[in-house]
Every structure is written in C-alpha cells, then in structure tokens.
Amino acid sequence: MSESFYTYKCGHTAKYEYIKPDGAKTQSFTLVYAHGFCSDPYGRKPEEIRKWCIENGMGFFRYEIAGHGSDAARFEETTINTYKSQIFEIVGEMVDGDVVTAGASLGGWLGLLAAVQFPQKVKGFLGLAAAPDFLKKYFEAYFRPEHKEILERDGKITFPTNDFTYVITKEMIASGNENLLLDKETIPYAGKTRLLQGMKDASLDWRTAPLIAQKLTGSDVKTVLLKDSNHRLGSDSDIAEIRRALDDFLVPAVHPGR
C-alpha cells in the first residue's frame, strides 16, 4: 500500500492513499472514503472497499481526517468545518473525474456534505451508519448541566471511554450546528444513494438512515436495515451487504441483464 502525506488548506497534514481508476474502463469513478470520529481509514470496511474498487477498476481515495491518525496530536484544534474543508478540497481539487463518496458515521456526514456541495461531480453516496448532525444529538442526549457548565467555563470537556479519551470543544459543537442536514425539510442531493444501518447500533439511532432517505431529493435511494448489526458494520455478513451496495454504483454494462 502506497501512502503519502498531504498538507490541506486547513493547515493539517495527514496521510492519504489515492489509487486512480483503471484507464481501460470507459466509464469509471473514484470512491472517496471518509472514516468515523476518533477512528482511522485502515479497518476492515475500508480494506474491503479498497479491494472491491481494485477488482472493478474503480479509483479509491482514503485519508486521515484532520486531527486523527498521524495528526491526532492536533485533534483539539479541529472542528466539523475543518473536516468539511478537507473533504471539499479532496473532491473538488485532488480527485479527477466522477466521484462516489462513502462514509462511516462522521464520515457519512462529511460524504453527504460533499455530495450536496458537488452534485455534478459526486455521482453517488454510500452511507455506512452515516451520522449527520451527531454532535447536536449527542449534546442534547448526554450532556448534563454539569457537563455544560464545564464546557462553558473551560471551552472543552474530556470524555474517557474503554478504548480512548477524547475532547469535545465548544468550537466543535458550534461548527456542528453550522452544518446540520437533518433539521432541513430536504437534503438537496439527487444522486444514487445507498444507506446501510445496523439496528443494534449502540452509538446511533437506526432510524437515522430512513430519515436521511426521506429527506434526500433523489429517487434512486435504498436503505438496508441490518437487524443484528452494530455501528461498526464489520462482520462477514455486513461486508457482503456493503459489496452488494457497491455493485449498484457500477455502470449497467458491467453487469449485463441487471
């Protein structure tokens, strides 16, 4: 795997991998994969998506979101606007040709923002437990008065988990509120969309996926609810569903008779 470092206009430097489409394909796209919050682009899902792209001659672009991975030391400096600027630069300037954005959790929010921003270039969107507006929902559901007091006083609050400790800043929450999608009557994107969502997701209300589908202005939208799947969507059966969803983005000539 060939990775490089890139310094984005937002000032953050992070790793990315860009595999261009097979030149023999008359019609192709590059799938831009955005990972989840406090995660990275190297887990099973992106590896399987990468494999699918190579098998089908499609391009593949994955990257570390600012403040994550090799840039983790600068996490507290980042906001949703930082992440949005980054994916807009990737889709708008770094990747040639047509794009399908794919995102897990936070990455789904970013991929959808990019689809709305570049509707002519982004031909499709794949949401994997896509979590638009998750900061607002998290703030409303879990922030008790004492949390809000700490946030107001210190400008940030620390949350320890079993795996890691992360910091939420006032700027992060404010920027999330500047980029809400689900509070709008419609999400102005008409491209092909596939949404996969586990119904045993402990991090995200599974009804988020049907709500996204309802608000999208396009008609080629499918939502797959996986009754026994969790937020990670990393089981063998989940991966099989992801591959089936990816197949839907291939041009008809690739699968005659469909």
Task: Give the ranges of each region predicted by the language model.
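The alpha/beta-hydrolase serine catalytic core
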Residues: 11, 121-225, 230-258
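Short beta-strand element of the alpha/beta-hydrolase
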Residues: 27-36
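Gly/Ala-rich beta-loop-alpha elbow adjacent to hydrolase catalytic centers
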Residues: 103-111
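Conserved alpha/beta-hydrolase
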Residues: 46, 50-72
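N-terminal cap/lid segment of alpha/beta-hydrolase-fold proteins
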Residues: 1-24
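Short beta-strand immediately N-terminal to the catalytic nucleophile in serine-hydrolase-like folds
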Residues: 101-103, 128
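The serine-hydrolase catalytic nucleophile loop
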Residues: 37-50, 207
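Catalytic nucleophile-loop/oxyanion-hole region of alpha/beta-hydrolase
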Residues: 68-94
